[in-house]
Amino acid sequence: MAEGSDQFNGRMGLIFASIGAAIGTGNIWRFPRMVGANGGGTFLVPWLFFLFIWSIPLVIAEYAMGKRSRTGTIGTFRIFAGKKFAWMGLWTAWISTAIGFYYAVVSGWTIKYFQLGITGALNGENVDTTEVWNAFLQNPGQVIFFQFLVIALTLAAIWKGAKAIEKVNFYLMISLFALLFLTLFLSLWMDFSDGSLDGALFMFTVDFDMLFEPEVWINGLSQSAWSCSAGMGMCITYAVYMSKDEDTVL
């Protein structure tokens, strides 16, 4: 890709795009589940260990490769590993595509529940949330509609390239952090008698006996990759659209 063509306007555009790629169901949905199933604070030990010795260095390497090659994952692997390993670039591209399959579905659910929330359908203590969920799933037309709505919105966001993604991400990232901090604020104001404080303490309490369980370390390794999209080709792709004068380590 020639210098001066479609690129991010600045560092913040690239940072927001990278954060958007990293912060997804792997962090917001999967991470709490992994913490709960692997000993709370115990899980944080292998997660942080692999995050800094494997996932973050891998992300930096991906950015360096994409910035140098100025092409997609297939071309990048062909340049750095030879033609025989170009299939690895295709594999990483397929991983991101496969992830998009379920993201479209889950994002469709999210938009549906946003609609239910603003229309007041979820208000009140007598609302049967299980019934609301089942009614939605039993209506294939609605499920498909919201999934295709997500696909259409995504296409609209990426249609004009990196600069369009940069503009959309600015608002999406601000909205994401606002919602996360609002959730944190509300959780701190909850009645601790319902177990909220116990959950917070559990998250930062290490059970040293569990550190000898291989499953905890395996889950920590996999979660570290989910936490920053390491090895999924997204960083290689975004690096193509960064300026050659930009630092690889942001």
Describe these PLM feature segments.
Residues 1-29, 58-63, 67-79, 86-87, ...:
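Membrane-interface "cap" regions at the ends of multi-pass membrane proteins
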Residues 2-6, 33-38, 68-91, 104-162, ...:
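Inter-helical loop and helix-membrane interface segments of multi-pass membrane transporters/permeases
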Residues 2-8, 12, 167-250:
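Membrane-embedded translocation segments of transport machinery
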Residues 6, 35-61, 88, 142, ...:
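Extracellular loop-to-transmembrane helix junctions
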Residues 10-50, 233-242, 246:
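Transmembrane helix-boundary motif of multi-pass solute transporters/channels
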Residues 13, 40-47, 84-100, 166-177, ...:
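Alpha-helical transmembrane segments and their helix-start/interface "positive-inside/aromatic belt" motifs
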Residues 16-22, 48-53, 91-102, 148-153, ...:
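Hydrophobic alpha-helical transmembrane segments of multi-pass membrane proteins
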Residues 50-55, 92-112, 174-185:
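Hydrophobic alpha-helical membrane-insertion segments
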